[in-house]
Amino acid sequence: HVFGVVMCLAVIFSSCGSNSSKSDDIKPKEVVSANKEVVTLALMPIVDCLPYYYAEERGYFERFGVSVKIATYKSKLDCDTAIVGRSALVGYSDLFHAMMMSEGRKVSVVNSTQGGWSLMVNKSLRIKKTSQLSYKTTAISRFSTEAYLLSSIPKTDEVLLPQVNDLYLRTSMVDNNQVDAAMLPEPFATQCRMRGHKAIWTAVSANNFGCMLTADKVKGAEEEKKIIAITKAYNMAVDSLNARNNMRENLSGILAKWGMQEFPVDSLHVPTYSHAASFKKEDIAAVSQFLRTRNCRFRSSGVLVNDRFCKKAETH
């Protein structure tokens, strides 16, 4: 079964072969209750997913009656495998991946996410603007948020785009001058800045098309209740993060889980989050246009813009 899931994703993202090695979970902290089944969230160590890590640290999931284990992955493709293989009830991805996966396996968007991206350039290069990137190597993950954002920047048509899905590897390649530049989310972009590399383009808290997905086979009342509870905990974490109440200790623990113990908490850019919300029709249209111009097979049905989880999390 697992082999079948992996092969399915390999076909869907046939042009997206990962340069990363097989992902190892980064020692997720488990919250276990003797009377509850533990559900897994497949997340990435980025600001988009921060409210879920924060909710775990603060015990918000248990407050809403769900026991959660967080599995941390280094790439969206690894999260996708966990989602469609049902080893995770909910997982992080983006709208580009969701629409391509829906061509072969149905998935539903639970809610969109928020975070920042930057185009980081190696400090040894005399590059100050994006027009100077022609025939330079910029590491990205193809058919994804970062590819879309890069395509929206003027005069980047001739940039060379090696695919590096693993964010730790992508950051390391900038550090070691193995690529000229990379599109990086927070906090990896800030980590690069701290090492002297330059940001020549930044989108802070922009619509980055990140999202939480669940396999569309999740239709049972119990599983839906768990997803709603997870979304309620997300909203509570958002309120706490936005209020900036006693964040420091919790964020230190989260950064340690992300393998960024040396990262100063005060340097972490925490955006002003919104409560869980679905994508808008114009988001679907923008992603559809991007995928269509690249001859990608995808599905853009209403399942991707439904807001049943978000609405129920606010009203129940």
Which ranges hold each PLM region?
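Bacterial N-terminal signal peptides that target proteins for export
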Residues: H1-F3
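C-terminal motif of bacterial Sec signal peptides marking the signal peptidase cleavage site
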Residues: I12-S15
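Bacterial signal peptide processing site
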Residues: G17-S20
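Stable alpha-helical elements in mature extracytoplasmic
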Residues: D48, E57, K76-C79, H97, ...
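Pocket-lining segment of extracytoplasmic ligand-binding domains
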Residues: L95-F96, L125, E158, D166-I254
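Secondary-structure end/capping motifs
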Residues: A221-R297
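Conserved C-terminal helix/tail region of periplasmic/extracytoplasmic solute-binding proteins
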Residues: R292-H316
